[in-house]
Amino acid sequence: YFSYNDKIIKILEAEYLNADHHFTSGTVISDKLEIACGSGILRVKKLQQESKKALNIEEFLRGTNILKDTVLK
């Protein structure tokens, strides 16, 4: 899970990409919600905002704009 705009968001489905990068862990590195990890990249596919129904990434991003270079906690 991660926190964004004071809301907890659970990652329900994701894909790990074994790729080198130079970003700080937690940094959003694409507009499709790919997140830099200590080693590799996490491509989020499905998530759930607190008190909301689960959404695939396309549905979620239609209603929530998480900008590239945002550092998630």
Swiss-Prot record:
Catalytic activities: L-methionyl-tRNA(fMet) + (6R)-10-formyltetrahydrofolate = N-formyl-L-methionyl-tRNA(fMet) + (6S)-5,6,7,8-tetrahydrofolate + H(+)
Keyword Transferase among UniProt keywords: yes
Record-linked InterPro entries: Formyl_trans_C, Formyl_trans_C_sf, Formyl_transferase-like_C_sf, Met-tRNA-FMT_C
EC number(s) reported in the record: 2.1.2.9
Molecular-function GO terms, alphabetical: methionyl-tRNA formyltransferase activity
Protein family: Belongs to the Fmt family.
Protein name (Swiss-Prot/TrEMBL): Methionyl-tRNA formyltransferase
Protein species of origin: Rickettsia parkeri
